[in-house]
Amino acid sequence: MKLSEIADNAGSRKKRMRVGRGIGSGKGKTAGRGGKGQTARSGVRIKGFEGGQMPLHRRLPKRGFNNIFRLDFAEINLDRLQEAIDAKAVDAGAVINAEVLVAAGVVRRAKDGVRLLGRGELKSKLTIEVYGASKPAIAAVEKAGGTVKILAPVKDEGEAA
């Protein structure tokens, strides 16, 4: 076989149909778009229209709402914090808060605050100031001899959690 003998299989490449090029082509005049109207125009489609049938987005019930008071936290686990301490990115002797974690690159941005979660093991004695922390995370920090200061306002017993 020579390089000049290489060719595509028969029928593997089909030429595109040039529409709107006279009635003899079979795709002249309306170019396969039917008659006049909205769907014959370019760039126009009726989004969600199902031919008169009730569209799916109207058949399904509305549900839920967006809470405008919702807080979005940057979450950090104990193992990630320990990795940063081992890599000397975070000083274990200093107070660890959101600004320190962002500066060290442990969290990208503080968002509405940092929440400490309990995955992993902590070996260092730390003083941590975070907006919130899970019970296992607090227990692990205190077991290692450290303290956790929660910056979030404390909810009363009467308030819903």
UniProtKB/Swiss-Prot annotation:
Q: Name one GO molecular function term.
A: structural constituent of ribosome
Where does this protein have compositionally biased stretches of type Gly residues?
21-37
> Region (Disordered) spans which residues?
1-44
Please name the PANTHER family in this protein's record. 50S RIBOSOMAL PROTEIN L15, LARGE RIBOSOMAL SUBUNIT PROTEIN UL15M
Q: What Gene3D superfamilies does the database record attribute to this sequence?
A: 3.100.10.10
UniProt cross-references to SUPFAM superfamilies, sorted A to Z: Ribosomal proteins L15p and L18e
Organism, by scientific name, is Rhodopseudomonas palustris (strain BisA53)
Q: What is this protein called?
A: Large ribosomal subunit protein uL15
Protein keywords: Ribonucleoprotein, Ribosomal protein, RNA-binding, rRNA-binding
Query: What do we know about how this protein assembles, alone or with others?
Result: Part of the 50S ribosomal subunit.
For this protein, the record's NCBIfam families field holds: rplO_bact (TIGR01071)
Q: Which gene encodes it?
A: rplO
